């Protein structure tokens, strides 16, 4: 990942069609407002199909009934998925009750999906409810601007309820970074909130008239927890504290997990260390990284457009020097930091401010009223009495934060009564995660969310059989190679290849600092479980004291570590 063969700063050639679309969109307006009035189709047409992503929505359909509807000569059952902008994942109980009501009354699935980017998604919003949901968010003090497409997406922040003051400072920076890098266009306010058109010309001083070459993801991380998986992100601010107070950030740039099956020009990559900056330079440096990627990112090939590929093409040193020049700063040497894990601390923890925080494990992040487990109703009941806030975590869990001692018993009783606390959940299940995939994701190649629960049960059985039932392996399943489930930072990562078939990756670590290598390609569940059974058996008997499964697979030579992904990811 050093400057081996620096390439051109700008890639010349025919621009990808997405660049035309953005240029002609009139700063993201397109004809969305007119399309909303078209009752002949349940979807958005032409360029609007992609433009709505800048407004936080993806057009989807129910893939379980797609073929049936085609036979009936009907268009797919179009519905939108909406993703809220929620930097740092903090939401008030009052806001929660508003989104809970909408999910129940105005979506096809009646669920709220907590995502591993610390926000929530609604699935199954019919076209007639699209404008009302944006207006509801507006009334709640929320929005969905820039949670998808070629912009800086929802900014993550480590969920650290214990060190309350440090977390609050880091969270404030996550919010500031999010606001600073937002699109300036008034399109969102005009289309969804009916704000009047202003007779001034739109300008995008940071993102530019054609926005970024590709999506861009940012985190604020508080060591020793790497719950946000910084190496999956383009730009990362690692908090450096002195006496419990935030003093600055280490900057790491160029992480990303998305690949394309069989395309060896694509690869997962860890972020590179750029250096340390004091707090006062944070926004200038964030802007400089984004504008450098804006100007140098590949706009001719979207498969090669992310920051990680720009870094590899121009060289880390060249990119870093440009950021220094644009921000008017010089990076100081990286300050020491260490990650020890990335899972959430499930259950009650007490903060240094004497407030209590309850982390609820939500399998797959899916809040729905299941038979005998009315999870969604339970969270709403807690919201009705809770005086603190809710925090959505990057592990798809929910923290009831800021609970005084006097309210603890009441909130725990509500959580238990609604199935939100289950003492029988294993540590393995708590450390397993999947993306949404079927039936709503149009990119899904294999099951993920619906596959995970039963698959984890089988893995639990393997662990128990080998006498390591109290241990865990970071396990992630993603339904396609785009990386949403962050399987390419797991100790065991399954990447969907086709229905019922996955690529099996091994060799990540618990801290999330190593890319796992593909071990077996295109295998089914039975074959995957056979491989896991054999390897867990070896791990249980051959491991050193405290050695994690991923570290063992590297040391034992089961897989070679990915050292320089641009060169050896596919070896």
From Swiss-Prot:
Cofactor(s) the record lists: siroheme; [4Fe-4S] cluster
Gene3D superfamilies, sorted: Sulfite Reductase Hemoprotein, domain 1
One cellular component term from this protein's GO annotations in UniProt: sulfite reductase complex (NADPH)
Biological process, per Gene Ontology: cysteine biosynthetic process; hydrogen sulfide biosynthetic process; sulfate assimilation
Amino acids binding siroheme: 484
Subunit structure: Alpha(8)-beta(8). The alpha component is a flavoprotein, the beta component is a hemoprotein.
Family stated for the protein in its record: Belongs to the nitrite and sulfite reductase 4Fe-4S domain family.
HAMAP family on file: CysI (MF_01540)
Known function: Component of the sulfite reductase complex that catalyzes the 6-electron reduction of sulfite to sulfide. This is one of several activities required for the biosynthesis of L-cysteine from sulfate.
The protein, known as: Sulfite reductase [NADPH] hemoprotein beta-component
Gene: cysI
């Amino acid at each position: 990942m050093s400057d081996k063969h620096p390439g051109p700063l700008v890639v010349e050639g025919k621009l990808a069609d997405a660049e035309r679309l953005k240029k002609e969109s009139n700063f993201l307006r397109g004809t969305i407002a007119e399309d909303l009035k078209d009752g002949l189709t349940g979807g958005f047409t032409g360029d609007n199909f992609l433009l709505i992503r800048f407004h936080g929505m993806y057009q989807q359909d129910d893939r379980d009934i797609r073929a049936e509807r085609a036979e009936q000569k009907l268009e797919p059952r179009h519905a939108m998925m909406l993703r809220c902008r929620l930097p740092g994942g903090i939401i008030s109980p009052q806001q929660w009750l508003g989104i809970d009501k909408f999910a129940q009354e105005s979506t096809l699935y009646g669920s709220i999906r907590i995502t591993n980017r610390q926000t929530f998604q609604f699935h199954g919003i019919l076209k007639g409810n699209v404008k009302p949901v944006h207006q509801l968010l507006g009334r709640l003090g929320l929005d969905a601007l820039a949670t998808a497409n070629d912009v800086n997406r929802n900014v993550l922040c480590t969920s650290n309820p214990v060190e309350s003051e440090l977390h609050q400072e880091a969270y404030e920076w996550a919010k500031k970074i999010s606001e600073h890098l937002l699109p300036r266009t008034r399109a969102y306010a005009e289309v969804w909130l009916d704000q009047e058109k202003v007779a001034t010309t739109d300008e995008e001083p940071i993102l530019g008239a054609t926005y970024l070459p590709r999506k861009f993801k940012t985190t604020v991380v508080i060591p020793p927890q790497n719950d946000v998986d910084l190496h999956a992100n383009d730009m990362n601010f690692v908090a450096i504290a002195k006496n419990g107070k935030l003093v600055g950030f280490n900057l790491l740039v160029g992480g990303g997990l998305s690949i394309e099956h069989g395309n060896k020009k694509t690869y997962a990559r860890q972020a590179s260390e750029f250096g340390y900056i004091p707090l006062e330079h944070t926004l200038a440096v964030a802007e400089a990284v984004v504008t450098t990627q804006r100007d140098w990112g590949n706009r001719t090939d979207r498969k090669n457009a992310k920051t990680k590929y720009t870094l590899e093409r121009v060289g880390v040193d060249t990119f870093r020097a440009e950021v220094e020049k644009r921000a008017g700063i010089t990076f100081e040497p990286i300050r020491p930091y260490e990650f020890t894990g990335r899972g959430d601390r499930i259950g009650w923890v007490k903060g240094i401010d004497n407030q209590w925080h309850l982390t609820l494990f939500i399998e797959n992040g899916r809040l729905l009223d299941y038979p005998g487990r009315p999870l969604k109703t339970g969270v709403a009941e807690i919201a009705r009495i809770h005086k603190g806030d809710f925090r959505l975590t990057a592990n798809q869990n929910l923290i009831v934060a800021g609970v005084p001692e006097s309210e603890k018993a009441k909130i725990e009783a509500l959580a238990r009564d609604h199935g939100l606390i289950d003492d029988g959940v294993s540590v393995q299940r708590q450390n397993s995660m999947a993306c949404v995939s079927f039936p709503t994701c149009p990119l899904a190649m294999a099951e993920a969310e619906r596959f995970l629960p039963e698959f984890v049960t089988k893995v639990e059985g393997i662990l128990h059989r080998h006498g390591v039932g109290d241990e865990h392996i970071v396990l992630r399943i993603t339904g396609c190679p785009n990386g949403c489930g962050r399987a390419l930072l797991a100790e065991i990562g399954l990447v969907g290849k086709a229905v019922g078939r996955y690529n099996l990756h091994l060799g990540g670590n618990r801290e999330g600092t190593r890319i796992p290598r593909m071990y077996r390609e295109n295998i089914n569940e039975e074959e995957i479980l056979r491989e896991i059974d054999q390897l867990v058996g070896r791990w249980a008997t051959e491991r050193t004291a405290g050695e994690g499964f991923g570290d063992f697979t590297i040391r034992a030579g089961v897989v070679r570590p990915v050292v320089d992904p641009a060169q050896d990811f596919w070896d």
